[in-house]
Amino acid sequence: MRCPFCRHEDTQVVDSRVSEDGAAIRRRRRCSACDKRFTTYERVELNLPAVVKKDGSRTEFDRRKIVASMQLALRKRPVAADAIDAAVARIEYQLLATGEREVRSEKLGELVMNELRGLDTIAYVRFASVYRRFEDVSEFADVIEEFRRASPSKPPRKR
């Protein structure tokens, strides 16, 4: 594989591991020319459904967009990159399991929200506020109240 830093053709695999969700192989590589290290991922290429946007246009499913959206919602939150990858893999699996050739963007957004709900409640609220286009504080309060009803009460944090 070509080095992303110096473009040299000769790189060696230093370490290989199966990802946490088992859907990819993570490889650490070292360039023999510049001695820099980098990570690559090997995963199965799947035929995921096309995404039908709200305006009716269609686009290919783009894993990177889902990862970027989740990373934005999870910005400065204590969630590992592997957990994000595992969540995206679960979304892809759910889409494949439907057997459909197309998925509405609204459905895809709901799948992302469900995964974020399990990863980090703050990220869930952030994503929901943009995805559902919250217009005032009461909508935030409604989502927070949903969490309070769904989870057992915790004692307040000491500051």
UniProtKB/Swiss-Prot annotation:
One of its GO terms (biological process) is negative regulation of DNA-templated transcription. A zinc finger (unnamed) spans 3-34. Residues 49-139 form the ATP-cone domain. Signal peptide: none annotated. Coiled coil: none annotated. Its cofactor is Zn(2+). Negatively regulates transcription of bacterial ribonucleotide reductase nrd genes and operons by binding to NrdR-boxes. Belongs to the NrdR family. This is Transcriptional repressor NrdR. It comes from Burkholderia vietnamiensis (strain G4 / LMG 22486).
